[in-house]
Amino acid sequence: MRIFKSHPLLKLVNSYIIDSPQPTNLSYLWNFGSLLALCLGIQIVTGVTLAMHYTPNVLDAFDSIEHIMRDVNNGWLIRYLHSNTASAFFFLVYLHIGRGIYYGSYQGPRTLTWSIGTIIFIAMVATAFLGYVLPYGQMSLWGATVITNLLSAIPWIGQDLVEFIWGGFSVNNATLNRFFSLHFLLPFILAALVLMHLIALHDTVGSSNPLGISGNYDRLPFAPYYLFKDLVTIFLFMLILSIFVFFMPNALGDCENYVMANPMQTPPAIVPEWYLLPFYAILRSIPDKAVGVVLMFGAILIILALPYLDKSILRGIQYRPLSKVAFYIFVANFLVLMQLGAKHVEDPFIVFGQLSTILYFSYFIIIIPLLSLIENELLDIATNYSSNKTLKNRKSLLSE
């Protein structure tokens, strides 16, 4: 349509969604972007709707959630959509990050895109934590108390900073109001960061591809080819999400959060949502509080250093067998950390957590740089051997 190329706003839509040239060999692993955009849209719409009926008060917050569930038209559907889409959001983000590591999407010229994506993930973690506090059940109260108390590990100003965040000497009305305001604001900041992520991707060289080579030689417009390909996974995602929302809405939640917050009674175990368990396991595996906090935040921030740690001359690990094995071990270790984060702080889980933490950081700091250098040398040896063999064959043909 001519209007898409003449209207100043629709021209942007046309260049990013309709006529955007994409490599012809993209697999379904490149569909996570559209699914994540859908998740963010669902979260913003359902979140704004829930905010219309929520009361950020320690006496009324729990009851306002029950009011939404029982009295608001389709309130149960809106709440379960919000909570289960949050889980889906993180699940897809982990797959998106994993695909980026596997195919080397962090390497130049996409380093800026990778950095913005990591900032998006950090903002997501903050938003999820703030949202977990709002229902003000037992896990909400004690989770907020434990996580905010981590800042007391900062020398000199730690305790003052914790009390400043609380607005008092414990979690109270001021805390809940602040968390609600920030939880409402952050998704819109996330949307702005997503736009920056998209601009950074399309204003460099566009999407990468499974081969790890330039896709400029063979490209297709995004619409209708990849638009319909995205719709396939969107419909599949909506089907799976509907199964969770309608048949097992609380499968990924914690039953303790259906008990009203009681500051006089500590729950048997204080655990965050499942998607934050790996980082919680790293925190708990370190006896020293300050070191544990540093490592927990470092576990996320170290992703920013990937472009500078990987010295390989090949993009991605699809043709690097040693790095491929190391990546699969890293994924398995991440899942182990997720399991350990839900366990009680006791032997042997403490020891397993420490070993998994060492392996997690070793993958980034030691294994990736070392294997990339080894594989570079092996590639040079193979290239020299191949060129020498070709030269000998040519000489033998000439002599004949």
Swiss-Prot record:
Residues at which heme b b566 binds: H96, H197
Gene3D superfamilies for this protein: Cytochrome Bc1 Complex, Chain C
TM annotation in the entry: 32-52, 76-98, 113-133, 179-199, 226-246, 290-310, 322-342, 349-369
Principal location listed in the UniProt entry: mitochondrion
MF GO annotations: metal ion binding; ubiquinol-cytochrome-c reductase activity
Binding sites annotated in the UniProt record for a ubiquinone: H202
Family: Belongs to the cytochrome b family.
Function: Component of the ubiquinol-cytochrome c reductase complex (complex III or cytochrome b-c1 complex) that is part of the mitochondrial respiratory chain. The b-c1 complex mediates electron transfer from ubiquinol to cytochrome c. Contributes to the generation of a proton gradient across the mitochondrial membrane that is then used for ATP synthesis.
Protein name listed in UniProt: Cytochrome b
Gene: cob
